Structures are given as C-alpha cells and as structure tokens.
C-alpha cells in the first residue's frame, strides 16, 4: 500500500490541512503501517488499531505540546508517535536504541509523560486538571 498521505505527516499541524476524505484515507494508511511494522518488531497491535481515528481526531483539534494527551494505557500511543515525527524510527520500535512502546518526553515534546499501564492515566489526568485549575497555573 502506497502511503502518500502518511509520508507527508511530520507533525500534528499537518493534519489540519486534510479534508474528511483524506483523513479517512490516512487512517487506513496508518492501520496498514501499524500491521506491517508491528509484525516485524512486535508490540501492542490491537490497542493501537482501536485508537487510530481517536488519536487523529485529538491531534486535529488539540495543539500538542501545549495541550496534553493522556492515553488510557501508554501502549496505545503508536498512532500518536506516527503523527509527531517518529514514523521513520518505527523500524526500531521497542528495540535497543529504538523508540519506546510508550509515550516518552525524551523522544518528543509531544509526549507529556512516561506512562505505561492504566493506573497511571487517571492520576496524570487529575494532576493536569488540578494544575490548570489551581491558582499556581
């Protein structure tokens, strides 16, 4: 499958230039990319296939890194990684010296936290909410 649209997405702002038909095509390209790459490197496939449209939609309306995205479980972030400039590094997903299978702020300013499993998501979201609604913000 030729990835014409995915090859042109290097940052979330690129998504805002797409029309609805292109977004639908992009989501299909992302699924194909994930299937192809995860079959080589291993990783969390189902959770990522289930969040493609959601992640694309979030990046079309939010402005990361200013806005923070908290994933239910960190290993749902593969589409997020593709949309934030790490597509070319996917050959080394979860490999030595490769990109992490979880959000990691050392990889990208678009990753707010290092988070893996579900119990951290609620705590992170509450913390962000408290920060932005407190007098300290």
Protein language model regions, located:
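Cofactor-/ligand-binding subdomain signature composed of acidic, glycine-rich
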Residues: 1-37
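Cofactor-binding active-site loop characterized by glycine-rich and histidine/acidic residues
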Residues: 2, 44-134
């Amino acid at each position: 499958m030729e990835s014409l649209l995915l090859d042109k997405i290097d940052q979330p702002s690129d998504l805002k230039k797409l029309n609805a038909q292109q977004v639908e095509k992009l989501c299909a390209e992302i699924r194909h990319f994930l299937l192809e790459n995860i079959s080589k490197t291993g990783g969390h496939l189902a959770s990522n296939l289930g969040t493609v449209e959601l992640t694309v939609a979030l990046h079309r309306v939010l402005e990361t890194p200013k806005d923070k995205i908290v994933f239910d479980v960190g290993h749902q972030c593969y589409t997020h990684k593709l949309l934030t400039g790490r597509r070319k590094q996917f050959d080394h997903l979860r490999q030595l010296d490769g990109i992490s299978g979880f959000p990691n702020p050392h990889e990208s300013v678009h990753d707010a936290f290092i988070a893996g499993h579900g119990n951290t998501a609620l705590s992170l979201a509450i913390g962000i909410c408290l920060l932005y609604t407190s007098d300290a913000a």
